[in-house]
């Protein structure tokens, strides 16, 4: 049987379900595939096939996450659903599945619960830009309790707005009833997907952003100069472009005099491609792995930031003991690792394996950093945690 080719005829969006345990995230994921399969836009995935999730690895951390794909008339979606709370935390922090938006599932009978709040905060810290709310289990609410649902909606809107998510649409429904095929509730799933289509914009393609390439290696070609190689993270680079070399030392400027891929010369290199760039006036000792080459003034190097981090448990190959303020592990960004000194937030004595916490980090060398960027924390050659930069300080 031949493999189907991926048809790139609709914009592609990555989304995920988030929310408190047992509020119906996986049931909703199954209900979406059921509702859309009726229109030939998805293959129906039942609850057990989603719940029986494969493991994936991101930055050395094992995450249980299930990926389902489906389409609406306008778009193609990849949807991630995780079974355990810790898996959500790890998935969001490591960016194993980068989300362009999320569906927050809240049970109408419970309202916002601790993990609801934690997932909203995490979504904000790791840069999930948009949220659509599905108020689930509405079939369990009696007529006389109907106004309680209005209160739950108000509380949710306030909670979301507090974290910077203003005006999120809230769709009421029942994932279980929709999964069972109840027509009026299936309609609510269609309404939800319409809200997702309308309220989660198609992200800017990486190719339209300012050029950036982390340097992986440096070569000297006699008579031609210095070549740096790496995978272009975003944007486009052309022969003749002015570029900056940022990180580890003072920022320098240069001009790209050649772009090569697989030993062939190209007029330009684009996001996702592995290329070699020939740089004018730069010696082999002026550049090193871990610096980045970028469009001038698009990125700066920094030494201090706040990060939302998840620290691995012992069973996940992490530390066996807690750490305290003053801890000095390696922080791994793109192609470089730099020692950093950790400061814990006020009122936090120590961080235990398995915790997720916001820390303040002072790096011993400057690195090209941006908010929303992912990093790994390593000690003695093994990953002990992962994080996302939530704020740059200096």
UniProtKB/Swiss-Prot annotation:
Residues 174-176 are annotated as: G5. Residues 81-84 are annotated as: G3. Gene3D superfamilies: P-loop containing nucleotide triphosphate hydrolases, Translation factors. Its EC number is 3.6.5.3. Belongs to the TRAFAC class translation factor GTPase superfamily. Classic translation factor GTPase family. EF-Tu/EF-1A subfamily. Monomer. This is Elongation factor Tu.
């Amino acid at each position: 049987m031949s493999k189907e080719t991926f048809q790139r005829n609709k914009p592609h969006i990555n989304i995920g379900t988030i929310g408190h345990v047992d509020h119906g995230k996986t049931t909703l994921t199954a209900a979406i595939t059921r509702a859309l399969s009726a229109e030939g836009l998805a293959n129906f995935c039942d609850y057990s096939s989603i719940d029986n999730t494969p493991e994936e690895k991101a930055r050395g951390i094992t995450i249980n996450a299930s990926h389902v794909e489906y389409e609406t008339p306008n778009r193609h979606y990849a949807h991630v659903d995780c079974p355990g709370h810790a898996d959500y935390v790890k998935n969001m922090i490591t960016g194993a599945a980068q989300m362009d938006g999320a569906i927050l599932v809240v049970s109408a009978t419970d309202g916002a619960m601790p993990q609801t709040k934690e997932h909203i905060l995490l979504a904000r810290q790791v840069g999930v830009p948009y949220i659509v709310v599905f108020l689930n289990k509405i079939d369990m609410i009696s007529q006389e309790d109907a106004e309680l649902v209005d209160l739950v909606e108000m509380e949710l809107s306030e909670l979301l707005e507090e974290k910077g998510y203003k005006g999120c649409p809230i769709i009421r429904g029942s994932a279980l009833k929709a999964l069972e095929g109840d027509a009026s509730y299936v309609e609510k799933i269609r309404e939800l997907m319409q809200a997702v289509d309308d309220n989660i914009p198609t992200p800017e393609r990486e190719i339209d952003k300012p050029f950036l390439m982390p340097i992986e290696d440096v070569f000297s070609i006699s008579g031609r100069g210095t070549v740096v190689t790496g995978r272009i993270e975003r944007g486009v680079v052309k022969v003749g472009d002015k570029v900056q070399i940022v990180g580890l030392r003072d920022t320098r400027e240069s001009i790209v005099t050649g772009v090569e891929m697989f030993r062939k010369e190209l007029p330009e290199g684009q996001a996702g491609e592995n290329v070699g760039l020939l740089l004018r006036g730069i010696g082999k000792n002026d550049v090193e792995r871990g610096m980045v080459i970028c469009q001038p003034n698009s990125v700066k190097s920094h030494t201090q930031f706040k990060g939302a981090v998840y620290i691995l448990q012992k069973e996940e190959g992490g530390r066996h003991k807690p750490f305290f303020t003053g801890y000095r592990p390696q922080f791994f960004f793109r192609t470089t690792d730099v020692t950093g000194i950790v400061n814990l937030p006020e009122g936090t004595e120590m961080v235990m394996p398995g915790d997720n916490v916001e820390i303040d980090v002072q790096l011993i060398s400057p690195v090209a950093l941006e908010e929303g960027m992912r990093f790994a924390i390593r000690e003695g050659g093994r990953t002990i945690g992962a994080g996302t930069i939530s704020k740059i300080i200096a």
